[in-house]
Amino acid sequence: MNKHFILTTILILSSLLSQSQEDLSILKGKELHNKVRLNFIPVEMPSDKFPELKPTMGLTGLHYQIPINDWLYGGADFHFAVTGDQGGLFTLGAELGINKQLYKNLYFDANFHFGGGGGYRKYINDGGFINPNIGLQYKKNNYSFGVQYSHVNFLSGEIKSNSVSFFVEIPSILRFTDYDKAHQEFVANNISPDSFWSKPVVKNAQQIRFDFFKPIGKSKKDNGSPLTETLSVIGFEYQKYLNNNTFLFAHTDAIYKGLRAGFMDLFVGAGYIPFQSKYINVFGKLGIGAAGGRIAPEGGLTIYPSAGIDLKLSDKLALSGHGGYYKAIDGDFEAYTVGFGLKYFGLNGGTSSEEKKHTNFYTQGIRIEIQNQSYFDVAKFDPPTTRYTTDLQLIGLKANYDLNKWLYIAGEAGFAYDGGSGGYAHGLVGGGIYSPRFLNNKVRGFIEFMAGAGGGAGVDTDEGIIVRPTLGLNYDITNSVSIIASGGRYYSPFGNVNSNNINIGLSFNLSTLSVKN
């Protein structure tokens, strides 16, 4: 009797399990042909009014552009100073653009950016800026370059410039499905070569990083005194693999100990894995980008070669350790670095890799949010003795990864555009819990906790550690777009910031196909 009961139970569970996996051929997919654009804008500085300034700042932009239709695109972008004496100037913005064919490979391209950020407050004030561009683009085989007439305007500040800028653009393909297909499992035993998903998988990795910079040489603080303190920074890195050994990456860091909050960096680059086994990867990387804030005024352009080892905890998780050398190209700041992090690997968007064809898959829910963030009565401190409060407005970019139907993890960057605090920025990581859906499945609540590093522009976070608990609601306009509203508290445990916070924005929702190991 017991044997029959056990056998029956096993058969029922096996049946339920098999029913939970659907055939991959029924999953409808979509493909977006996105673009990654890198541009350079020479910005005329107000050196007549401020003789201490160099006459020109070189501003580089990194843009991720998504087609809305065959002539209209939108996206998000970072700008950062690389030449001149404004190292540490960073901005985050949103953009809308037009791209129309004129003749054969020649295209008209125009766009408009709005964002927030900055560096030295007396030159940019609130931090809000606009950057319209208009010009020509030459395309061939999905790659392109172009020239534009550009206007850079920090609206309440002193930096206002017209110039000729240049850009290059490379393709980036995103294959995905609808957000309501998230958290489902699929099997592909005999998938047709003509199937939408019969493509190579894209390997990627995401990493939370902790780095420690030991300054050497002539490194100086912004007051001219020698910089000898070890700088502790927290950061995030994204890696996209070109093949099993070579990858591209982007990463950013913000300081939380060693100096008053305000130092940050942003790098892009490439890496190579000369040795890998079941348990470890040995890698080398070269990053080039920008860094600055709370150090002596420099151009910003910085290189960061490094090498390290990944210790694999599973097929998807690894502990990563690294060491490197950090050097300003147009300045004196340099440091030896050591660091560690937790790395998550994924295989997305297809069914085959260099090693094998995969058969078991799941769909991963992702939400990308653009927000307006309001912070009220934020404590500020301007040395030596001036203390006061102000209301801040930030533009925020946030990515949420659903672990299941109820839990998610998130990462966020935010930059000030109003409140006399241009140059304030934060980077946060954390997670949250969803409520059940209600009101015809259109509304879902959430509770969230985020923590990280933030500072600059006199915002009194001390060395930079901040936390932000919030409660909020999502309302689905469509399956792909939601309105987000939330409120909570913004608190610095070692500084004097303790403020109410309200966030309103849009969420763009999708699901990606991932290999289930």
Which residues are covered by each model-predicted region?
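Bacterial Sec-dependent N-terminal signal peptides
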Residues: 1-25
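Transmembrane beta-strands of outer-membrane beta-barrel pores
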Residues: 40-46, 78-84, 98, 114-120, ...
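Repeated loop/turn-to-beta-strand initiation elements of outer-membrane beta-barrel proteins
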Residues: 70-76, 104-108, 138-147, 174-179, ...
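Residues that define the transmembrane beta-barrel architecture of outer-membrane proteins
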Residues: 54-60, 86-92, 126-132, 160-164, ...
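Outer-membrane beta-barrel "beta-signal"
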Residues: 40, 160-192, 209-215, 335-357, ...
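Surface-exposed strand-loop-strand hairpins of Gram-negative outer-membrane beta-barrel proteins
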Residues: 42-61, 76-77, 213-237, 376-396
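Residues on the lipid-exposed face of transmembrane beta-strands in outer-membrane beta-barrel proteins
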Residues: 62-66, 94-100, 134-138, 166-170, ...
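Transmembrane beta-strands of outer-membrane beta-barrel proteins
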Residues: 34-38, 72-76, 108-112, 145-147, ...
